[in-house]
Amino acid sequence: MDKRTTQFLKSRFQSYYKNAEIGLPDHLPNREWAFIFYDDMPEKMMHRHKSFGSPGEALDYLYGMAPAHVYNSTAYYEYPDAKKMNEKNWLGAELIFDLDADHLPNAPRNYADMLELVKKEALKLLDFLLDDFGFSEQEIQLVFSGGRGYHFHIVSPKVLTLGSSERREIVNYVSGRDLEFKYFFREVAMDGDFGTGSKTFKGMKNVPMKCTLVGYDSGWGRRIALYLTDYMKRESEKKYKKDMFPELRRHEKVGDTTIKKLINIANSETGLKDILEKGRLDFDVRNFKEIAAYFMQESAEDFLHRFGASVDEPVTADIKRLIRVPGSLHGGSGMLVKKLALSELEEFDPLNDAVVFGERPVKITASKPFSVQLKGKDLRIEEGIQEVPEYAAVYLICRGVAEYGHRRNQPDTV
């Protein structure tokens, strides 16, 4: 990045910070801040161990310095500006989740598709935070990172003193790592109107057994119920019976009789509903506990891909992590690190809603062809000199595929 390009970006960032609404963290004097400046480019040197005593001091600093990247600590310190970490005196830390397309298997290369995929992961994580862990919406802060993902901040007092190992356990839970499916299926003595009959068999030596799904109405049990019912419905709708339930047919105790019963349950008015609302899995099928556990184990990869949340474990486990400040700009994209209400996530479009610069034409020199979708437009950039809207110029320069202005002896692109 040449000097003129650096000055252009710094001036654009400074114009933004003049009136920016920055999401300053609570307990501001107890937070460490860190910055990467355009004046250090192309080196990405982090300047850290800084603290601010008041909101005005922090905002004045951002406007005056116009940094490329802005971070604050997720931890609270007694002495946040101490130069050595062991001298800061750690007091606690928010619980942080980082979802980034870089950590998703088979993430698409197209930026818009990539962002859509990571949003789905964010929605799955949000379900865990609200349903499984019971955090209130007020305890969850959601932020678009300005790049390829989302950050979740849990600010509940219940999590502040959790250590790294406890935080890793939380990651293991939301990802479904080491999930033991056999413990979700249980055989119990049939009693009353729950299983295949309505009689009570208490006191009998040989009591009929029924298979039930443990925890069918919440947590992983609910997700297993959804997966099973979706599978049964999908398979029963196939045209030919011989093509139905191929995964179950591989089990030695599953024959045509069992398949027929499963089809009947899937096609009945109450069969699938009873799984979701009662955890009922007896179906008058012998060995169904064993069969169901086998199916879930065989389908584990697909099940966890659908329901597990892929989060960056090192970020969550790090109790002294630096994270981007909401309301700041991401120096790798020029986009806004945007705080969102939880209700906004599903409809949020980063390539429109996190773009802060305007339409003013800016001349750039692109080093290679490049395409991107911004503000509802498909922008196709050719190598060479051309004019683009300011928001596109900032994005392309931040991505490292263009310089500001034009070079001598460089032909304009028509």
From Swiss-Prot:
<dbReference type="GO" id="GO:0003899">
    <property type="term" value="F:DNA-directed RNA polymerase activity"/>
</dbReference>
<keyword id="KW-0808">Transferase</keyword>
<dbReference type="GO" id="GO:0006269">
    <property type="term" value="P:DNA replication, synthesis of primer"/>
</dbReference>
<dbReference type="Pfam" id="PF01896">
    <property type="entry name" value="DNA_primase_S"/>
</dbReference>
<keyword id="KW-0464">Manganese</keyword>
<keyword id="KW-0639">Primosome</keyword>
<keyword id="KW-0804">Transcription</keyword>
<dbReference type="InterPro" id="IPR014052">
    <property type="entry name" value="DNA_primase_ssu_euk/arc"/>
</dbReference>
<dbReference type="InterPro" id="IPR002755">
    <property type="entry name" value="DNA_primase_S"/>
</dbReference>
<keyword id="KW-0460">Magnesium</keyword>
<dbReference type="GO" id="GO:0046872">
    <property type="term" value="F:metal ion binding"/>
</dbReference>
<feature type="active site">
    <location>
        <position position="98"/>
    </location>
</feature>
<comment type="similarity">
    <text>Belongs to the eukaryotic-type primase small subunit family.</text>
</comment>
<dbReference type="GO" id="GO:1990077">
    <property type="term" value="C:primosome complex"/>
</dbReference>
<keyword id="KW-0479">Metal-binding</keyword>
<feature type="active site">
    <location>
        <position position="312"/>
    </location>
</feature>
<dbReference type="InterPro" id="IPR023639">
    <property type="entry name" value="DNA_primase_ssu_PriS"/>
</dbReference>
<comment type="function">
    <text>Catalytic subunit of DNA primase, an RNA polymerase that catalyzes the synthesis of short RNA molecules used as primers for DNA polymerase during DNA replication. The small subunit contains the primase catalytic core and has DNA synthesis activity on its own. Binding to the large subunit stabilizes and modulates the activity, increasing the rate of DNA synthesis while decreasing the length of the DNA fragments, and conferring RNA synthesis capability. The DNA polymerase activity may enable DNA primase to also catalyze primer extension after primer synthesis. May also play a role in DNA repair.</text>
</comment>
<keyword id="KW-0548">Nucleotidyltransferase</keyword>
<feature type="active site">
    <location>
        <position position="100"/>
    </location>
</feature>
<keyword id="KW-0235">DNA replication</keyword>
<keyword id="KW-0240">DNA-directed RNA polymerase</keyword>
<dbReference type="GO" id="GO:0000428">
    <property type="term" value="C:DNA-directed RNA polymerase complex"/>
</dbReference>
<comment type="subunit">
    <text>Heterodimer of a small subunit (PriS) and a large subunit (PriL).</text>
</comment>
<protein>
    <recommendedName>
        <fullName>DNA primase small subunit PriS</fullName>
        <ecNumber>2.7.7.-</ecNumber>
    </recommendedName>
</protein>
